[in-house]
Each structure stands twice: as C-alpha cells, then as structure tokens.
C-alpha cells in the first residue's frame, strides 16, 4: 500500500494548531477543511491530463485538462463531512457518496448503518475522507463496500493516522493509497490516537 505522509510546512503547521486542547469548534472545523484541501492537492498529483484546443479570447489555444475516471468524494459519517469541502474546493463537480459507520466503544469494531453511493462507482476514483485512522476498522469496512460496488481506484485521506491503523489497512487493502497529514505514535487502551486530536467528530460538530 502506498502511504504518503504529507510534510508540507503548511500541513504541519495546521495540524499543530488542531492539537490545541482548547481549540474552538469554529477553528477546528476550518482547519479540518483546509488540511483536507491540501491532502487533496497531494492525492491528485498523479491524475493524467490531455491537451485539448479551446477557443480563447484571441483565438484557439491549447490547454491541459484532466482525463480518465471522474471523482467521487466519500465522507465517512459523521466526522468525514468536516473534510469534504476541502476536496470539493478543488473538484467541485465530484459526486458525493456517503457511508455511515460508527465504532462500538466497547469492542472497537465498525458498525455500518447507512450508505448512498454514486451509481457508477466502477467508473470513478474514490477519495475517502475521515479525520482519524485509528484501528482502521471504519476505513477497511468502507473500502470493502466500495469494492463490492465495483470501485477499483481508491485513495484514503486522513488527518492523523496511527501505525496500528496503517498496518491493518495495508493488510486488508494493499492496493489502495493512503494520504495523511501526520503519523502519530500509537493507540491508547480505548483505541484513541496518541497524541492525536481528541474526538474529531465532536470537535467538528461541537458535541460531546
């Protein structure tokens, strides 16, 4: 599995701001979208382009346009919604495919409860967004679902990843790509990433 830890200074700075314990909901939400935007820029760097001729202001002009499969952004509910706008900033025409999965706090296992995917998943590149890759369970379950629906090109975008989650995701889906703003130290006994960001969903939505 291709794993990319994006070490751009802007990404490192913004993730550092998100680690502040007393950060406001507004600020955390803004930063989640901003880092999501920067990760999208990195994850789409290998998209193929083709040269086409258009009618410019002073006659025909050759320009580059992205070719190949179209994109669907796949936020994992609910926290993934906080990164979605960052993707759409660059790819406003992307279809939105939603997957609802929550983690059982006792077993730490993923529990799926909702899905609404683009009808042509086999013809699209899926950019799956979820702030935290902890145990990897939710991401693995989401990729399982996307593959069952015919999607063969999948990139996962997360703010923070734990080594345990990366290992589990690679074992289950070695053919996908992972882009993360930070690879943290480990998981604690409750399955939270250390040092991590805390509960990203609560911080994005202002709940506890």
Swiss-Prot record:
Required cofactor(s): Mg(2+)
Which biological process terms from the Gene Ontology are attached to this UniProt entry?
Answer: UMP salvage; uracil salvage
Keyword terms, alphabetized:
Allosteric enzyme, Glycosyltransferase, GTP-binding, Magnesium, Nucleotide-binding, Transferase
Among the Pfam families in the record, one is: UPRTase
Disulfide bond annotation, renumbered to this chain: none
The entry marks the following residues as binding 5-phospho-alpha-D-ribose 1-diphosphate, namely 78, 103, 130-138, 199
Per its UniProt entry, what is the enzyme's top EC class, as one word? Answer: transferase
Q: How is its activity regulated?
A: Allosterically activated by GTP.
| Catalytic reaction equation(s) | UMP + diphosphate = 5-phospho-alpha-D-ribose 1-diphosphate + uracil
Cofactor, how bound (note): Binds 1 Mg(2+) ion per subunit. The magnesium is bound as Mg-PRPP.
Q: What is its EC number?
A: 2.4.2.9
Which residues are involved in binding uracil? Answer: 193, 198-200
Write one Gene Ontology MF term.
uracil phosphoribosyltransferase activity
The UniProt entry, under InterPro entries, shows: PRibTrfase_dom, PRTase-like, Upp_B, UPRTase/APRTase, Ura_phspho_trans
Identify the stretch annotated as signal peptide in this record: none
Q: In which pathway does it act?
A: Pyrimidine metabolism; UMP biosynthesis via salvage pathway; UMP from uracil: step 1/1
Can you tell me which family this protein belongs to?
Belongs to the UPRTase family.
NCBIfam families linked to this entry: PRK00129.1, upp
What this chain does, per the entry, is described as: Catalyzes the conversion of uracil and 5-phospho-alpha-D-ribose 1-diphosphate (PRPP) to UMP and diphosphate.
This chain belongs to the protein called: Uracil phosphoribosyltransferase
Q: Write the gene name.
A: upp
